Regions:
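Catalytic machinery of carbohydrate-active enzymes
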Residues: 1-280
Length: 280
Protein backbone atom coordinates (compact mmCIF):
# COMPACT_ATOMS: atom_id res chain seq x y z
CA UNK A 1 0.00 0.00 0.00
CA UNK A 2 0.86 3.65 0.25
CA UNK A 3 2.86 3.37 3.49
CA UNK A 4 4.97 0.56 2.07
CA UNK A 5 5.79 2.69 -0.98
CA UNK A 6 6.53 5.66 1.26
CA UNK A 7 9.08 3.73 3.29
CA UNK A 8 10.61 2.12 0.21
CA UNK A 9 11.44 5.59 -1.07
CA UNK A 10 14.14 5.67 1.64
CA UNK A 11 14.19 9.45 1.83
CA UNK A 12 16.97 11.06 3.84
CA UNK A 13 14.91 14.14 4.63
CA UNK A 14 11.22 14.98 5.01
CA UNK A 15 10.02 18.59 5.17
CA UNK A 16 6.47 18.97 6.47
CA UNK A 17 5.13 22.43 5.62
CA UNK A 18 1.59 21.65 6.74
CA UNK A 19 2.33 20.72 10.33
CA UNK A 20 -1.01 18.99 10.78
CA UNK A 21 -1.50 15.70 12.59
CA UNK A 22 -1.93 13.63 9.42
CA UNK A 23 1.14 15.03 7.67
CA UNK A 24 3.11 14.71 10.89
CA UNK A 25 2.23 11.03 11.20
CA UNK A 26 3.25 10.45 7.58
CA UNK A 27 6.55 12.20 8.27
CA UNK A 28 7.23 9.87 11.20
CA UNK A 29 6.20 6.74 9.30
CA UNK A 30 8.35 7.67 6.31
CA UNK A 31 11.45 6.39 8.05
CA UNK A 32 13.44 9.45 7.00
CA UNK A 33 16.43 10.18 9.22
CA UNK A 34 15.85 13.93 9.20
CA UNK A 35 12.30 15.17 9.67
CA UNK A 36 11.61 18.92 9.68
CA UNK A 37 8.31 20.53 10.63
CA UNK A 38 6.79 23.35 12.68
CA UNK A 39 6.76 23.22 16.45
CA UNK A 40 3.43 22.58 18.08
CA UNK A 41 1.53 20.05 20.12
CA UNK A 42 3.15 16.61 19.75
CA UNK A 43 5.71 17.95 17.26
CA UNK A 44 8.43 16.03 19.12
CA UNK A 45 6.67 12.78 18.18
CA UNK A 46 6.79 13.53 14.47
CA UNK A 47 9.97 15.51 13.85
CA UNK A 48 13.51 15.33 15.14
CA UNK A 49 14.15 18.84 13.78
CA UNK A 50 11.14 20.97 14.78
CA UNK A 51 11.27 24.64 13.81
CA UNK A 52 9.53 27.52 15.59
CA UNK A 53 7.84 29.57 12.86
CA UNK A 54 6.44 33.09 12.97
CA UNK A 55 2.89 32.58 11.71
CA UNK A 56 2.14 36.30 11.98
CA UNK A 57 4.25 36.84 8.87
CA UNK A 58 3.24 35.91 5.35
CA UNK A 59 3.14 32.13 4.93
CA UNK A 60 5.84 32.42 2.28
CA UNK A 61 8.20 33.74 4.93
CA UNK A 62 7.02 31.35 7.64
CA UNK A 63 7.50 28.28 5.47
CA UNK A 64 10.83 29.66 4.33
CA UNK A 65 12.05 29.53 7.92
CA UNK A 66 11.93 25.72 7.74
CA UNK A 67 14.21 25.74 4.72
CA UNK A 68 16.72 28.29 6.02
CA UNK A 69 18.87 25.58 7.62
CA UNK A 70 18.80 23.39 4.52
CA UNK A 71 19.42 25.67 1.56
CA UNK A 72 21.50 28.70 0.70
CA UNK A 73 20.01 31.73 -0.97
CA UNK A 74 16.38 32.74 -1.20
CA UNK A 75 13.67 31.74 -3.64
CA UNK A 76 12.17 34.76 -5.42
CA UNK A 77 9.03 36.06 -3.73
CA UNK A 78 7.68 37.30 -7.02
CA UNK A 79 7.80 35.54 -10.39
CA UNK A 80 9.15 32.00 -10.41
CA UNK A 81 11.23 30.87 -13.41
CA UNK A 82 8.95 28.06 -14.58
CA UNK A 83 10.37 25.86 -17.33
CA UNK A 84 7.61 24.48 -19.55
CA UNK A 85 8.05 21.96 -22.32
CA UNK A 86 6.88 22.68 -25.85
CA UNK A 87 4.26 19.94 -25.54
CA UNK A 88 2.66 21.77 -22.61
CA UNK A 89 2.52 25.07 -24.48
CA UNK A 90 1.15 23.35 -27.59
CA UNK A 91 -1.54 21.62 -25.52
CA UNK A 92 -2.74 24.94 -24.08
CA UNK A 93 -2.58 26.56 -27.51
CA UNK A 94 -4.77 23.73 -28.78
CA UNK A 95 -7.27 24.22 -25.95
CA UNK A 96 -7.61 27.91 -26.77
CA UNK A 97 -7.94 27.28 -30.50
CA UNK A 98 -10.60 24.61 -29.90
CA UNK A 99 -12.66 27.23 -28.04
CA UNK A 100 -12.04 29.81 -30.78
CA UNK A 101 -10.46 32.18 -28.27
CA UNK A 102 -8.49 34.68 -30.32
CA UNK A 103 -9.04 37.90 -28.36
CA UNK A 104 -7.35 38.86 -25.06
CA UNK A 105 -8.87 36.81 -22.26
CA UNK A 106 -9.17 36.84 -18.50
CA UNK A 107 -8.88 33.73 -16.34
CA UNK A 108 -11.47 33.51 -13.55
CA UNK A 109 -11.41 30.97 -10.73
CA UNK A 110 -14.68 31.38 -8.79
CA UNK A 111 -14.04 28.52 -6.37
CA UNK A 112 -12.11 28.22 -3.13
CA UNK A 113 -11.28 25.60 -0.53
CA UNK A 114 -14.01 26.87 1.82
CA UNK A 115 -17.43 28.45 1.30
CA UNK A 116 -16.61 31.59 3.30
CA UNK A 117 -13.96 32.48 0.70
CA UNK A 118 -16.36 32.25 -2.25
CA UNK A 119 -17.71 35.41 -3.84
CA UNK A 120 -21.42 35.05 -4.72
CA UNK A 121 -22.43 33.41 -8.02
CA UNK A 122 -24.64 36.33 -9.02
CA UNK A 123 -21.72 38.72 -8.51
CA UNK A 124 -19.53 36.69 -10.84
CA UNK A 125 -22.32 36.67 -13.43
CA UNK A 126 -22.59 40.46 -13.25
CA UNK A 127 -18.81 40.84 -13.48
CA UNK A 128 -18.59 38.56 -16.53
CA UNK A 129 -21.24 40.66 -18.29
CA UNK A 130 -19.19 43.79 -17.68
CA UNK A 131 -15.95 42.14 -18.81
CA UNK A 132 -17.57 40.88 -22.01
CA UNK A 133 -18.60 44.46 -22.80
CA UNK A 134 -14.86 45.14 -23.11
CA UNK A 135 -14.49 42.34 -25.68
CA UNK A 136 -12.59 40.10 -23.29
CA UNK A 137 -12.69 36.33 -23.58
CA UNK A 138 -13.76 34.51 -20.41
CA UNK A 139 -11.87 31.38 -19.35
CA UNK A 140 -12.95 29.77 -16.09
CA UNK A 141 -10.91 27.11 -14.32
CA UNK A 142 -11.91 24.66 -11.64
CA UNK A 143 -12.86 21.08 -10.85
CA UNK A 144 -15.20 19.36 -8.38
CA UNK A 145 -17.30 21.88 -6.45
CA UNK A 146 -15.87 24.63 -8.65
CA UNK A 147 -17.61 23.06 -11.64
CA UNK A 148 -21.02 23.37 -9.99
CA UNK A 149 -20.32 27.03 -9.27
CA UNK A 150 -19.20 27.66 -12.85
CA UNK A 151 -22.32 25.93 -14.17
CA UNK A 152 -24.47 28.14 -11.93
CA UNK A 153 -22.77 31.25 -13.31
CA UNK A 154 -23.26 30.05 -16.89
CA UNK A 155 -26.96 29.39 -16.23
CA UNK A 156 -27.43 33.07 -15.41
CA UNK A 157 -25.72 34.03 -18.69
CA UNK A 158 -27.23 31.79 -21.40
CA UNK A 159 -26.08 34.08 -24.21
CA UNK A 160 -22.51 34.60 -23.01
CA UNK A 161 -19.63 32.35 -24.07
CA UNK A 162 -17.91 31.07 -20.94
CA UNK A 163 -15.09 28.62 -21.60
CA UNK A 164 -14.52 26.12 -18.78
CA UNK A 165 -11.11 24.44 -18.66
CA UNK A 166 -11.17 21.55 -16.19
CA UNK A 167 -8.53 19.20 -17.62
CA UNK A 168 -5.37 21.18 -16.90
CA UNK A 169 -2.52 20.09 -14.66
CA UNK A 170 -0.15 22.53 -12.96
CA UNK A 171 2.17 22.95 -15.97
CA UNK A 172 -0.79 23.62 -18.27
CA UNK A 173 -2.25 26.13 -15.80
CA UNK A 174 1.04 28.03 -15.74
CA UNK A 175 1.11 28.05 -19.55
CA UNK A 176 -2.49 29.30 -19.59
CA UNK A 177 -1.66 32.05 -17.09
CA UNK A 178 1.28 33.16 -19.21
CA UNK A 179 -1.06 33.64 -22.17
CA UNK A 180 -3.87 35.38 -20.25
CA UNK A 181 -4.19 39.13 -19.83
CA UNK A 182 -5.04 38.93 -16.13
CA UNK A 183 -6.69 36.78 -13.43
CA UNK A 184 -9.63 37.28 -11.06
CA UNK A 185 -10.45 35.02 -8.14
CA UNK A 186 -10.70 34.50 -4.41
CA UNK A 187 -8.15 33.30 -1.87
CA UNK A 188 -7.09 29.95 -3.35
CA UNK A 189 -4.19 27.89 -4.63
CA UNK A 190 -4.70 28.90 -8.29
CA UNK A 191 -4.51 32.56 -7.22
CA UNK A 192 -1.02 32.01 -5.78
CA UNK A 193 0.02 29.98 -8.82
CA UNK A 194 -1.14 32.79 -11.11
CA UNK A 195 0.86 35.34 -9.12
CA UNK A 196 3.97 33.15 -9.22
CA UNK A 197 3.59 32.88 -13.01
CA UNK A 198 3.80 36.68 -13.24
CA UNK A 199 0.16 37.26 -14.15
CA UNK A 200 -1.56 40.50 -13.16
CA UNK A 201 -4.40 39.60 -10.86
CA UNK A 202 -7.32 40.90 -8.83
CA UNK A 203 -7.83 38.94 -5.60
CA UNK A 204 -11.21 38.95 -3.83
CA UNK A 205 -10.70 38.64 -0.07
CA UNK A 206 -13.10 38.14 2.83
CA UNK A 207 -11.99 37.02 6.31
CA UNK A 208 -8.56 35.82 5.12
CA UNK A 209 -5.71 37.94 6.48
CA UNK A 210 -3.93 39.49 3.53
CA UNK A 211 -0.79 40.02 5.61
CA UNK A 212 -0.53 36.23 5.70
CA UNK A 213 -2.32 35.00 2.57
CA UNK A 214 -2.17 37.81 0.00
CA UNK A 215 -0.78 36.89 -3.43
CA UNK A 216 2.83 37.94 -3.78
CA UNK A 217 4.02 39.91 -6.74
CA UNK A 218 4.26 43.45 -8.04
CA UNK A 219 1.06 43.22 -10.08
CA UNK A 220 -1.42 41.85 -7.53
CA UNK A 221 -4.42 43.81 -6.27
CA UNK A 222 -6.30 42.67 -3.15
CA UNK A 223 -9.91 43.86 -2.84
CA UNK A 224 -12.18 43.77 0.19
CA UNK A 225 -15.75 44.79 0.81
CA UNK A 226 -16.83 48.01 2.46
CA UNK A 227 -17.98 46.30 5.67
CA UNK A 228 -15.52 45.08 8.27
CA UNK A 229 -15.43 41.56 9.63
CA UNK A 230 -17.13 40.82 12.91
CA UNK A 231 -15.05 39.97 15.98
CA UNK A 232 -16.10 36.33 15.72
CA UNK A 233 -15.54 36.07 11.97
CA UNK A 234 -13.62 32.91 11.15
CA UNK A 235 -13.84 29.80 9.00
CA UNK A 236 -16.75 28.36 10.99
CA UNK A 237 -19.04 31.26 11.80
CA UNK A 238 -19.75 34.94 11.24
CA UNK A 239 -22.52 36.95 12.87
CA UNK A 240 -22.72 39.10 9.72
CA UNK A 241 -22.69 36.23 7.23
CA UNK A 242 -19.26 37.26 5.91
CA UNK A 243 -20.35 40.66 4.66
CA UNK A 244 -16.65 41.59 4.54
CA UNK A 245 -16.71 39.66 1.24
CA UNK A 246 -20.30 40.06 0.09
CA UNK A 247 -20.12 43.87 0.40
CA UNK A 248 -17.50 43.78 -2.35
CA UNK A 249 -19.73 44.59 -5.33
CA UNK A 250 -19.11 43.64 -8.98
CA UNK A 251 -18.72 47.27 -10.08
CA UNK A 252 -15.73 47.71 -7.78
CA UNK A 253 -14.09 44.54 -9.08
CA UNK A 254 -14.72 45.61 -12.67
CA UNK A 255 -13.13 48.97 -11.87
CA UNK A 256 -10.05 47.19 -10.55
CA UNK A 257 -9.98 44.97 -13.64
CA UNK A 258 -10.13 48.06 -15.85
CA UNK A 259 -7.30 49.69 -13.89
CA UNK A 260 -5.30 46.49 -14.26
CA UNK A 261 -5.72 46.56 -18.04
CA UNK A 262 -4.61 50.20 -18.11
CA UNK A 263 -1.51 49.34 -16.06
CA UNK A 264 -0.70 46.48 -18.43
CA UNK A 265 -1.01 48.77 -21.45
CA UNK A 266 1.20 51.39 -19.80
CA UNK A 267 3.97 48.84 -19.29
CA UNK A 268 3.96 47.71 -22.92
CA UNK A 269 5.65 50.79 -24.51
CA UNK A 270 8.49 50.69 -21.98
CA UNK A 271 9.05 47.03 -22.72
CA UNK A 272 8.97 47.67 -26.46
CA UNK A 273 11.50 50.49 -26.17
CA UNK A 274 13.77 48.37 -24.00
CA UNK A 275 13.64 45.54 -26.53
CA UNK A 276 14.41 47.96 -29.34
CA UNK A 277 17.46 49.32 -27.54
CA UNK A 278 18.89 45.92 -26.64
CA UNK A 279 18.16 44.36 -30.03
CA UNK A 280 19.21 46.87 -32.73
Amino acid sequence: GFLRKLRKATSDCIIDMEGERFSGVLSRLSGAKNRYGPTGKNAHRFYNNPRALNYEKHRYNAFGEILDVLVTGKAPANILPYTLGSEVREAVKGFLESKLITQPFVVIHPGASADYKKWPVEYFASLVTQLKSQNLGIVMIGVGDDTRMIDAIAEQLPNVAIHHFDQLGYPELVALFQKAQFYIGGDSGPMHLAASAGLDLVALFGPSKETIWAPLGDHSRVLRGTKACGKDCDAWQCEFNYHCLTSLIPEVVFGAATATRVAIDMRKPAFANETKETNP
